A protein has these predicted regions:
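Electrostatic, structured charged patches in enzyme active sites and in nucleic-acid/phosphate-binding
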Residues: 1-150
Length: 150
C-alpha cells in the first residue's frame, strides 16, 4: 500500500492575522493597535471609510495573447475585454489625514501607494499621509497628528 503524500500549501510572505475589536474586523493586529491608539487620543478616523479609484476601468479593444493573470492556463487571445479599475482603500481616513498600517507590504502595494499619491496630487486633495509599520510608529503617528492640530 502506497503512503499518501500531502503537499503543504505554500504561503505568501504576508500572514497578518484577522482580529476583531469593538465589533470591527481588522485585517491585522497592527490596524487594531492603531485604532486603539487613535481612540485613546480622541482622534476621529473612520476604519476603511473610503475607497478611491486611482485608475479608471477601460475597454481594451486590441488583441492580446497571454495566459491568465496568475500565469496559468492556456496562452490565447484575451484582448477585447473590459479592464477593471484599480482601487485603493486606506486603513484610516480622518478629516485631514490618511493612515495606512503596513507591517509588510504585499506585491501590489508599492505601485498602488504611488498611484494613490498621484491621485491625491492630480485631484488637489490635501491629506497628510502616514504609513506606520510597527506599534512604535503608530504611537509616533498619533503624536504627529496631535501636534499638527495645535
Amino acid at each position: 500500500m502506497k503512503k499518501k503524500i500531502y503537499k503543504r500549501k505554500k504561503r505568501g510572505p504576508v500572514q497578518a492575522k484577522k482580529v476583531t475589536y469593538d465589533g470591527i474586523k481588522f485585517a491585522s493586529g497592527l490596524e487594531r493597535y492603531m485604532y486603539m491608539a487613535l481612540k485613546k487620543a480622541k482622534i476621529k478616523a473612520k476604519y476603511e471609510g473610503q475607497t478611491y479609484e486611482v485608475v479608471s476601468g477601460f475597454n481594451f479593444i486590441n488583441p492580446s495573447h497571454e495566459r491568465t493573470a496568475n500565469g496559468k492556463g492556456e496562452f490565447k487571445q484575451r484582448g477585447g475585454k473590459k479592464i477593471l479599475p484599480i482601487k485603493y482603500t486606506p486603513d484610516f481616513v480622518g478629516k485631514d489625514f490618511i493612515i495606512e498600517c503596513k507591517g509588510r507590504a504585499n506585491e501590489s502595494f508599492p505601485i498602488r501607494w504611488k498611484l494613490f499619491k498621484k491621485y491625491l496630487a492630480d485631484n488637489e486633495l490635501y491629506h497628510r499621509l502616514y504609513k506606520p509599520q510597527n506599534q512604535k510608529e503608530c504611537d509616533e503617528t498619533v503624536k504627529l497628528i496631535l501636534s499638527s492640530r495645535k
